[in-house]
């Protein structure tokens, strides 16, 4: 029998935070029908024609080859990558998002008769986004972490986005791997007409916050926190895989 649970966590209290006006746009963006459209429009048409990165060619193979026995997926979206990755029934899967609608959709999509699936509502930008037991209990640490098309949506400077890798490595095993992709806003090829329209719309509507996001700073942050780092720029997309976190003594 499958096990699907949902938890809310914060760094200061055990009760869920009250919604704020700032959270409300995300509630509107991640309604179920828009999440369905997301798969077709964003991951299919826009990623290929605007950003020059075909998901099925570049990102799904990377995802499939880097899922461990205890996997953490950050930024649930629609659960598309997890669904396409053909997660093993023996994998313990934890899905994280700061928005309940998206997380519930991903959890429902990834249900498996055997797989143990756990959902957490939390803010990944916080220094300690998970309960203390994830730090003290090695059995709860993750051997693989994924974050696809997440970083360009976070409304913080690129330096704050880079700190996520510092926070995450504390929750990973010694041989753990983190992998993902995000749309860059700086130091990439010139946008075609379609990309210009999409980028302008995403920025104006607060979907993208990536004007200063660049490959150099992301790669530097990865190399500061992991022993083995591989990065690629595919079209306007930064793709990465980093292994073996540099853990503090």
UniProtKB/Swiss-Prot annotation:
It catalyses: 2-acetyl-3,4a,8,10,11,12a-hexahydroxy-1,4,4a,5,12,12a-hexahydrotetracene-1,12-dione + S-adenosyl-L-methionine = TAN-1612 + S-adenosyl-L-homocysteine + H(+). Its EC number is 2.1.1.-. It is an enzyme of class 2 (transferase). Residues 1-15 have a biased composition (Low complexity). It comes from the Eukaryota. InterPro entries: Methyltranfer_dom (IPR025714), SAM-dependent_MTases_sf (IPR029063). The keyword Phosphoprotein does not apply. One of its GO terms (biological process) is methylation. The keyword Ribosomal protein does not apply. Keywords: Methyltransferase, Transferase. One of its GO terms (molecular function) is methyltransferase activity. Residues 1-26 are annotated as: Disordered. Pathway: Secondary metabolite biosynthesis. O-methyltransferase; part of the gene cluster that mediates the biosynthesis of the linear tetracyclic TAN-1612 neuropeptide Y receptor antagonist. The decaketide backbone of TAN-1612 is synthesized by the non-reducing polyketide synthase adaA via condensation of one acetyl-CoA starter unit with 9 malonyl-CoA units. The FAD-dependent monooxygenase adaC then performs hydroxylation at C2 while the polaketide chain is still attached to the NRPKS adaA. Belongs to the methyltransferase superfamily. This is O-methyltransferase adaD. The gene is adaD.
């Amino acid at each position: 029998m499958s096990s699907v649970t949902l938890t809310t966590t914060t760094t200061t209290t055990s009760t869920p935070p009250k919604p704020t006006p700032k959270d409300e746009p995300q509630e509107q963006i991640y309604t179920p029908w828009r999440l369905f459209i997301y798969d077709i429009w964003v991951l299919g048409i826009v990623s290929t024609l605007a950003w020059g990165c075909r998901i099925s060619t570049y990102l799904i193979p990377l995802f499939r080859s880097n899922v461990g026995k205890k996997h953490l997926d950050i930024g649930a979206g629609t659960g598309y990558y997890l669904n396409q990755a053909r997660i093993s029934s023996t994998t313990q899967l934890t899905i994280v998002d700061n928005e309940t609608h998206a997380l519930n959709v991903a959890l429902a999509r990834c249900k498996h008769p055997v797989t143990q699936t756990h959902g957490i509502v939390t803010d990944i930008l916080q220094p300690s986004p998970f309960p203390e037991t994830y730090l003290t209990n090695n059995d709860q640490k993750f051997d693989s972490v994924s974050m696809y098309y997440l970083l360009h949506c976070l409304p913080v400077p690129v330096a704050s986005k880079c700190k996520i890798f510092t926070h995450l490595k504390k929750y990973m095993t010694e041989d753990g791997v983190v992998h993902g992709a995000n749309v860059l806003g700086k130091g990439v090829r010139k946008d075609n007409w379609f990309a210009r329209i999409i980028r302008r719309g995403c920025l104006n509507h607060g979907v993208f916050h990536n004007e200063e996001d660049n490959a150099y700073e992301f790669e530097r942050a990865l190399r500061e926190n992991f022993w083995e780092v591989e990065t690629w720029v595919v079209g306007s997309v930064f793709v990465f895989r980093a292994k073996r976190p540099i853990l503090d003594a």
